[in-house]
């Protein structure tokens, strides 16, 4: 009962609490775009949504935000340490959703997990630059440095990887994956530029 109260229930509650679900929708669309059945990409879409939850829980702590989706942030209601742990669970769940999807062939699961791992790494790298520059009071950042940070922090996980993960499940060709990657990186970067 305590494990559920301190860990699983808060993550489930946060993930179900709203949001636009754009990233998992892009995953399903990526699958359909290459001729696949969207339902086959549900585990990848769920993995992307739980990553979003984990990233937002951690981001709220880093930014000292008070509200998320109109509600008190997880660290406000659960405490900082517990919230970090809840976010960490979300990060581990990312690969688990796909790993446990026995409806996908092993090679497809592996390829999707590789993309999801890339998504996690790039997003964390971008966040490290953003947080480090703010911490150090760096305002001498060149435009190309900002674009590198923004593409890593947002573009990979907001559009490029969701589209490619879905396309992998749908049996997309290397050319189709490359096209979705290019579109996704441009769309994700545009989202970050608008957000900033």
Positions of the model-derived regions?
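Mg2+-dependent prenyl diphosphate-binding active-site environment of isoprenoid biosynthetic enzymes
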Residues: 2-196
């Amino acid at each position: 009962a305590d494990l559920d109260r301190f860990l699983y229930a808060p993550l489930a509650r946060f993930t179900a609490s709203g949001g636009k679900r754009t990233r998992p929708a892009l995953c399903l669309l990526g699958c359909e775009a290459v001729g696949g059945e969207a339902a086959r990409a549900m585990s990848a879409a769920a993995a992307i949504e739980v990553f979003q939850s984990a990233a937002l829980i951690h981001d709220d702590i880093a930014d000292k935000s008070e509200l998320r989706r109109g509600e008190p942030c997880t660290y406000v209601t659960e405490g900082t340490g517990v919230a970090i742990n809840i976010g960490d669970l979300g990060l581990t769940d990312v690969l688990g959703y796909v790993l446990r999807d026995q409806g996908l062939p092993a090679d497809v699961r592996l390829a999707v997990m590789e993309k999801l791992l890339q998504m996690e790494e790039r997003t964390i790298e971008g966040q490290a630059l953003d947080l480090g520059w703010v911490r150090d009071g760096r305002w001498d950042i060149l435009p190309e440095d900002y674009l590198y940070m923004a593409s890593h922090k947002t573009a990979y996980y907001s559009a490029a990887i969701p589209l490619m993960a879905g396309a992998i499940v749908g049996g997309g060709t290397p050319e189709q994956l490359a096209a979705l990657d290019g579109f996704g990186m441009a769309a994700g970067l545009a989202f970050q530029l608008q957000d900033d």
